[in-house]
A protein has these predicted regions:
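Sequence contexts marking disulfide-bonded cysteines in secreted/extracellular proteins
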Residues: 50-52, 274, 302-304, 311-313
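Hydrophobic alpha-helical membrane-insertion segments, chiefly the h-region
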Residues: 32-42, 309-314
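Extracellular Ser/Thr-rich, low-complexity/disordered mucin-like segments
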Residues: 288-298
């Protein structure tokens, strides 16, 4: 893997050298709720989540590391065969990996680099088609997204093709920063930050982001110490990040292994989710309590209509 520079000169993405062997690149979005009932409790009726979800850019292949990540019950994985996309032919090993993950209820997305709009659309479309035909993936993760107005037609064309091949398929975009707002109509989830904690602390958030549910945004924060972990997670939630990955790893590939505090990170996100679900359940229960009094009238109506003694007398000081 090597760090490359984005069109603005900043270090933006990690891509595989073409000469490297096929690798498995997985992003595991982890629902840290444990049961289907817990998942449903954490979702509002419009599909937005009350909880953060951890996702893992697992740019590693070691079976032990994969097993450690998998124990967190991933819900979404992003599969990259060649460092650019689906490769030139199906790989039996990865078919087996995908089948096992799907049998466990995991959603699989196929990784495809767009090279900031420079990769031919036909090549990206071929990735989407081949991923579905060879591995039965559910959706596509478009990496190295340009995010500017001039390239929007290119990404809309890709999204249109993906939906023709796989109606309703989820599309993730990774511009590594906030794109133009119009890109929210292209991607279901947009990775709006990818960088160090030092940069993240003062990273700007456009005002328009507050109009979207957290489940529409993902953020990756690396070079984050154990002492900074909790603060990073709180910042991510306050900045509308429904999906978050924080790691102490740094260097040319901070995704070479799981964070040293992976277990603690998973526990922290899960505990925070439990608090949010419990708080929401309490608020819902309170909203369903019977109105005061035995007439079925609301407190305000009863008091306004002169029923003070019966319904409101106990409030008199």
């Amino acid at each position: 893997m090597r760090m490359t520079s984005g069109p603005d000169g900043g270090q933006r993405r990690f891509v595989a050298l073409a000469s490297r062997p096929a690798t498995l690149i997985v992003v595991a979005a982890v629902l840290l709720l444990g049961t289907a009932a817990g998942v449903m409790a954490a979702l509002t009726t419009d599909g937005s989540s009350r909880c953060q979800q951890a996702f893992v850019p697992a740019y590693f292949y070691a079976a032990g590391t994969w097993s450690q990540a998998d124990q967190a019950k991933p819900s979404v994985m992003i599969l990259d065969i060649s460092g650019l996309g689906a490769g030139s032919a199906p790989v039996p090993h990865f078919r087996s990996v995908v089948s096992q993950a799907q049998a466990a209820g995991v959603t699989i997305l196929g990784y495809s680099s767009t090279a900031y709009g420079l990769r031919p659309a036909a090549a990206v479309e071929a990735d989407a088609r081949d991923y579905k035909a060879w591995y039965g993936v559910t959706g596509v993760f478009l990496d190295e997204v340009q995010g500017i107005a001039r390239e929007l037609p290119y990404y809309r064309q890709l999204a249109s093709y993906i939906h023709r091949v796989s109606p309703g398929a989820p599309i993730w975009l990774n511009p590594g920063g906030y794109p133009g707002r119009s890109y929210m109509s292209v991607g279901d989830v947009v990775m709006v930050f990818e960088g160090t904690y030092a940069r993240y602390r003062d990273a700007p958030v456009p005002q328009w982001a507050s109009h979207y549910q957290p489940a529409r945004f993902a953020q990756t924060i690396y070079a984050t110490s154990g002492a900074q972990l909790d603060r990073a997670l709180r910042l991510a939630w306050s900045r509308q990040a429904g999906y978050v990955y924080v790691t102490n790893r740094s260097g040319s590939n901070p995704y070479r292994a799981l964070p040293g505090y992976w277990t603690r990170e998973v526990a922290a996100i899960g505990a925070d989710c439990s608090r949010r679900v419990a708080s929401a359940a309490k608020a819902d229960a309170e909203s369903r309590r019977p109105d005061p009094g035995d007439s079925g009238l609301s407190l305000g109506w009863a008091c306004d209509r002169g029923h003070w003694r019966r319904h409101c007398g106990h409030l008199a000081g």
